[in-house]
Amino acid sequence: MGRLRSAAMGALPVFRIELGGQAGHSELHTSLSKNLYPMARLYHVPLSPFCRKVRLVLAEKKIDVELIEERYWEADPDFLRRNPAGKVPILKMNGRTMPDSMAICEYLEEKNPTPPLMPQSAEGRYEVRRLVAWFDDKFHQEVTSKLLYERVNKKLMNQGYPDSRNVKEGAKAIKYHLDYMAWLLDHRRWLAGDSMSIADFAAASHLSALDYNSDVDWTRSDTVKDWYAKIKSRPAFRSILADQVPGFPPAKHYNDLDF
C-alpha cells in the first residue's frame, strides 16, 4: 500500500500513505477509482480504541487515509466546529464531516462492501452491533477507561496521577471480559460468527490499546491469544503496531506478531 510518512501540519503530526514512482501513482489512481474515494482525512488519537476501530476498517478495505492527530481535550475551536461533541474520531470524506466511530464504520461498509465486515443476515448484523456496543460501552467503562485513561490519558491531559483504585478495578474486570471472549471463541470461529467482522476490530482496538502498556494477561486464555494473533498479523494492523506515544514507550511484545 506504500509507506506511512509523518509530515507537519501545525503542531499536529500528519501521516500520509505515499506511493513512489510512476507505477505507484498509477496504483494510487486505480485504488481510488476502484473504491470511489478521494483521499479521506481522519482526526484521531493513536491509542483511542474508537479511532483504532475506524483505522482498521479503512485499512482492511484499502481506503487511503490521511491521519491527523487531534488533541481533542484542548477544545480547539476549529475542532469543535467539526464536531461540537468534542470527540474523536472524525472522518472527512466526500465532502462530509462524520463523527461517531460505529456510524463511520457502517458508512464505510455500505459505501465499500468489499471485503465484507458485516454479515448478510439481520441476525448476524444484530450480533455484530451487540458486541461492538459491548466493547465500546461495557468494556470501555469497566476496563479501558480505568487502565488506559488512568495510566496514559491523565498524564497527556495534565489531569494528575493515576487513581490506584480505578487501576485495580480495571485489572480485575478485564479477567471477566477475557473469559467471555474465550467462551464466544469456543463456540465460534470469530467473535460474532464464522467471519471476521467489525466486532473483532472493536475488541482488538481496545485490547491493542491496553496491550501497548502491557495491561492484557495473554496467559489467561490461549483461545483469545490465538484470536488476537490472527488479527494482529493482518496487514490492516500494521499502522496500529507502529503507533508511538511520546513519554510512553510500548511494551516490548506490543508489535511482535508471535508475542
Map each language-model feature to its residues.
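Short, hydrophobic secondary-structure boundary micro-motifs
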Residues: 115-120, 142-143, 191-194, 219, ...
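Phosphate-coordinating loops and pocket residues in cytosolic domains that bind phosphorylated ligands
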Residues: 81, 233, 242
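Acidic/histidine-enriched, glycine/proline-rich intrinsically disordered or flexible terminal extensions
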Residues: 244-259
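Short Gly/Ser/Thr- and charged-rich N-terminal loops/segments
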Residues: 5-7, 20-24, 33
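GST-like fold's C-terminal all-alpha helical module
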Residues: 135-233
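Extreme N-terminal basic, low-complexity initiation segments
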Residues: 1-14
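GST-like domain detector, emphasizing the conserved glutathione-binding G-site
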Residues: 16, 27-168, 182, 258
